[in-house]
From Swiss-Prot:
It comes from the Eukaryota. The keyword Ligase does not apply. This is U1-poneritoxin-Dq1b. GO terms for cellular component: extracellular region. It is found in: Secreted. It comes from Dinoponera quadriceps (South American ant).
Length: 9
């Protein structure tokens, strides 16, 4: 799951 806003990381 994306832990950031849009980033997939």
């Amino acid at each position: 799951l994306p832990l950031d806003d849009l980033s997939d990381t």
